[in-house]
Amino acid sequence: MIGPLGVSGFKTSLDIDTTEAADTAKGSMSLVGLSSIDATSPSAALVCPSGSVVLVSLKESGCATFIFLCEGSSLFIMSSGCFLIASLSCVGLTVFETLFSLVFDTAYFICGMVIQL
């Protein structure tokens, strides 16, 4: 398991094993690591099928918004604060209605992956 990333805001590199993460994803995208929520700029890494790592930053403005920088696409969280539904093209892979379940009542956000191809 890849532990807490401990990053704040956008970084250019992360000290994680992207090969292992890509193998774990098994052809799908996955969000790895946990980041403490401080309501300012917690971040995590999105691992694409190719093994490339894309950063994600959580920002709150009325309703929280996830911004995934992946092939120029963006994902947005719904106002309910529970699910994120979006269309994302990442390394040639197009994913529709990717649902990430978020837990906001703890010190961490936990992201689950539900992808139908």
Swiss-Prot record:
Superkingdom of source: Eukaryota
Transmembrane domains' residue ranges: 76-96
Keyword Transmembrane helix tagged: yes
Compartments, as annotated in UniProt: Membrane
Keywords annotated in UniProt: Membrane, Transmembrane, Transmembrane helix
Main localization, broad class: membrane
More details: Overlaps SIR2.
Name of this protein: Putative uncharacterized protein YDL041W
Organism name: Saccharomyces cerevisiae (strain ATCC 204508 / S288c)
